[in-house]
Amino acid sequence: MVYGVSKMANKNRKNLKPVKSDRKDRISKNHSKKKVNKNSLKKVATTDITVNANELNWKSVDIPDTLDDFGGFYGLEEIDGVDVKVVDGKVQFITKDNKNVKKEPEQVEEKDNIVFQEDDEDVNMDELIEFKNFDDIKEGELSAASDDEESEFHVSTEEEGEEGEEAEDQEEERSEKENVKGEAGTVVTEDQTNDDLLQSNVFSSNVDIDDQEPPVLPEWSENMDLSFTVLKGLSGLGFTRPTEIQLKSIPLALKGHNIMGKASTGSGKTLAYGIPIIEQLIKDTSNDRSIGLIFTPTRELAHQVTDHLQKVWTKMNKLNKYTILSLTGGLSIQKQERILKYDGSGRIIVATPGRFLELLERNPDLIPRFAKIDTLVLDEADRLLQDGHFDEFEKILKLLGKARKIKTSIDGKPTGSGWQTMIFSATFSLDLFTKLDKTSWKILKTAGGENNEMEQVLNHLMKKIQFKSKPVIIDTNPEHKVTSQVKESLIECLPMERDLYVYYFIMMYPGTTLVFCNAIDSVKKLNAFLNNLKISSFQIHSSMAQKNRLRNLEKFKEQSEKNSKVGKPTILIASDVAARGLDISGIKHVLHYHLPRSADVYIHRSGRTARGDNEGVSVMICSPQESMGPLRKLRKVLSTKKSSNPRKTKWQNDVPMLPLEPDIVSQLRERSKIASELADDEIATKSLHKDDNWLKKAAEELDIELDSEEEEKDQFLARNKTKKLNKQLEKNENKALKYQLNELLKMPLRKDLRKSYLTGGLTNLADTLVKHKGHNSIIGHDKVDALQTLKGKKHK
């Protein structure tokens, strides 16, 4: 029998349609068309079947473990494709599908509802594959179709109106399955038995070391027992020696100890827990069991951790690209569920708690799978376990722990004792989480009076996490909360001049700069402000879609590489969504547009620079009101523990002021003012348009008329709208300001405007211009570096 069924939807019997001989678009132009006698195909329609309730093939409803109460209903059964009618007070069940009726021993069930009778003389089975145009056939599709069973031929019969998202998802699923089958482009041999054997042992024999030279990494191999695969991956990435946290934690983790690790930002904590998990993955001979589960507080950090581990794992193993898998919100949950069903996928999971809990609730069958893990990791654990952030994680631990106790053994080993737990962060101090604008600085603990700080934090964490044994505490940065490679500085200004001094810093010290703001509106406004000044800037914040965040990060990295070659600045403006864990190479400066709300946020913000062995600069832009309040408390918390005499060091002298040049600031002031007005106009216009669209859409959904007077009666909406309208500019005024700003941008900046001649003064401007030396943006100014300036080296 012949059916016109798409290969990707052959399981959906609703897509079955009679084959039509007049569909020219399904027949190849390069092949001869063979006519099919219309009378040779006869459609035999099925009839309605009336049955009793006991004769139906009911399916039981499984109660998921994620539901504490199911309303008292248990033992429920359900069935699809059955109509219910009441005739003369009697209930009748009517179905058209014999599958819904229980089979009798002597009955033979038909496979399809529509049966075609064919005339062998008029129809040739081999030529029915011609229904698809050769221009639409993709590479390898014909060979894949030829491997199907002889009794079925899959030919697409989807109508043009039915194409779209469904066909797109099916094509994506097909490509994903091809990637899972062979990422390295392996050749399938005729001996299917040998092929299956190789696939089943793919992790146990991951590298052919006969043709590979062993990497020379003595500092790694002498201090810890690592496999050839990991050493080769580290060598390819250029990691010739371990960092302090890696040197102390990896040997203990390989032995199965629980670890609580504290290290400064950029010190390699990801590989400190990632390498032991990869070693477990290499030694494990199974192909479906999940080995490790890693939780991160943000989506961007989860994708970054996944990328780092994949670079170590896949450098020598071109296998399944989904072996190390990230599960985060903002991306298609259906795609993530589909990938988890592939063989060998999800051996190591990197997830955010919210999306992971959602997956467990949607598919309870995943709970026993992830309950078999060997290692649980909490990256940036202090953030995950703060009050208000722990509810989702607590539910996950409860579900996995309950399922783990039910399982008796894994490969003959008892599983009730729990899993290995590793928690890492750069901040483990309870004082760091206090709000700087609400806590009195007098009650903060003094420097040097907290010798057992890590023990206190551990006792706090053990109330929330059930460790199978007490963790080993590893603190590689006990004296400093902010790494010593970060040089801190301060700019004091009026609250309305923050934009001006951001612009000054960028022009004076061009490079790759990351600017942090406390509010999303400030991120949007500052991004528009810098774009008006012709500066390459990008933004990421929590209101953006996840794909847009990742896209902006990629654009920022690409643009920074281009601008660094010509000495131009590249700016990334972010809310605190990017403060933790993100490892963006080349960040020279971190600007705090607003003072952070807590000390731990400041530490993680500053840690986006000075990654690895590099040094960086962290600059706070602070108003006078902040200086006497939050700034004082921040410096009190961050003061060095083991200072020889901490009371004699005033908090005002703890952070040096950034040197400013008033003549340069005065030249930038007018530019900044105009750019700020244009940015306010742009943001207000977009916001008003968005509000109007939202109100219209809400009125349409409620089927009511939108009354403008009702909006005026609402004082909050009216005040907000008036505030935005006051920031808007007329079209002519907007054009005039843009023209004025462009003219100002064409004028070069000069170090000293009082000079009448190029060759006058201490600096020969003519010589500087001819020889192309000196500052790229300021004529007569030497090239300056913020790091060297703060180190004490004077530049003219």
UniProtKB/Swiss-Prot annotation:
Its EC number is 3.6.4.13. Residues 19-28 have a biased composition (Basic and acidic residues). Belongs to the DEAD box helicase family. DDX24/MAK5 subfamily. Residues 250-446 form the Helicase ATP-binding domain. The keyword Nucleus applies. The keyword Secreted does not apply. The gene is MAK5. It comes from Kluyveromyces lactis (strain ATCC 8585 / CBS 2359 / DSM 70799 / NBRC 1267 / NRRL Y-1140 / WM37). GO terms for biological process: rRNA processing. GO terms for cellular component: cytosol; nucleolus. Residues 1-39, 142-197 are annotated as: Disordered. This is ATP-dependent RNA helicase MAK5. Keywords: ATP-binding, Helicase, Hydrolase, Nucleotide-binding, Nucleus, Ribosome biogenesis, RNA-binding, rRNA processing. Coiled coil: none annotated. Residues 29-39 have a biased composition (Basic residues). The Q motif is unique to and characteristic of the DEAD box family of RNA helicases and controls ATP binding and hydrolysis. GO terms for molecular function: ATP binding; ATP hydrolysis activity; RNA binding; RNA helicase activity. It is an enzyme of class 3 (hydrolase). It is found in: Nucleus, Nucleolus. Residues 501-653 form the Helicase C-terminal domain. A motif (DEAD box) lies at residues 379-382.
